[in-house]
Amino acid sequence: MRTLDKIVVVGASLAGLRAVQTLRREGFDGELTLVGAEAHVPYNRPPLSKSVLRGDEDVTLPGAEELGDDWLRGRQAVRLDAGSRTVVLDDGAELGYDGLVVASGARPRRLDGVHTLRTLEDALALRAELDSGHEHVLVIGGGFIGGEVATTARQLGRKVTLVDSGPHPMHAGLGAQAARWLAGHHERNGVELVTGVRVTEVTGGQVRLGDGRVLSADLVVGGMGVTPNTEWLDGSGLAVDDGVLCEPTLYATGSVNVVAAGDVARWPHRLYGDALIRVEHWSNANEQGAVAARNLLAGPDAAQPFADVPNFATHVHGARIQTAGLPHLADEERVVAGDPDEDRFAVAFARDGVLVGAVAVNAPKDLIRLKRSIAAGEAI
């Protein structure tokens, strides 16, 4: 382990918390400061679209109690001077560092008049709206956030319309067969689907679509993706392009003392021909925060590449949907277990005959098997 005296971690969500925990557990005993834009202790985001909307507020991440006094909550990094190794905060304070972990996350894309769901405050505000008696909820975007909000709203007895620009919800992430099944699953559970069209404007409860139609709803919620929080790095000298560009080891490109982790990190993945990827899911932030911290302590020459197989899981109307790898890179997909008509199946995705992704619906054991095959670079 190389000698570092001061480490700053920017971002107090999952990746930042895991970085702090790992630094201490790996023996770093120098000055360690965690900067978090939110006033809350680090919390789990996946429940925000599920249990929090139903009334649960206990989402604190295990390990948050380990943070101690060197945690600046409610403070935001606004500038990085990589030359002088200084992070500038929104109150004018300057934090010097020998090592820096960039885990500043991402923020939701917004549309005027639309509720978004990223923070605990977002979830509590949306819950208050649901509790106020709104009967018809319109969800923009059928990704995992949109699907979970639609599920929760139906559980609460609300009428739900889901608008998605693709041919089926989650078509890009799940592939044609699983996305087609998901569309039917939504409809069987009472969700009205409007697909293949974009929302262009929301005024009050009026939602205008790209084809000229206007839909009405009491409450409009958006799950339209996120944008990485990199503006504070402008002028820092770090390479930024849809995230912080990194080496395979998560070191910021060209840097020997800055690493990145979580939603903000974009790095070349060896399983995919060193294609640059950025992953926005819980499991990636969980693992990447720890690996980035270990690599920062080890130094660039001893750092290990991060090559975990990306994976995520969601529950939609009682069905467990899991993915591994990057199905959207495939030129072939094939059902390899179960049957979509029986609501239990697994799909393998390949490019040039080699597995690159998998999707499983109510088939966790098949997903585990396929994930191992992806990591091994096996043929479909």
Name each model-derived stretch.
Residues H134-H136, F144-T200, D308-V316:
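Rossmann-like dinucleotide-binding cores of NAD(P)H-dependent redox enzymes
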Residues R2-D5, R266-P364:
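Mid-to-C-terminal Rossmann-like scaffold of FAD/NAD(P)H-dependent oxidoreductases
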Residues R2-V8, T60, E66-L138, R208-G210, ...:
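FAD-binding core/adjacent interface of flavoenzyme oxidoreductases
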Residues P364-E378:
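A short, polar/charged loop-to-alpha-helix boundary motif
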Residues R73-R75, D81-A82, R118, D164, ...:
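Short loop/edge segments at beta-strand edges and connector loops
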Residues D112-H134, G205-R208, R213-V291:
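FAD-site-proximal beta/loop scaffold in flavoenzymes
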Residues R2-L72, A150-G173, R369:
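Beta1-alpha1 glycine-rich phosphate/pyrophosphate-binding loop at the start
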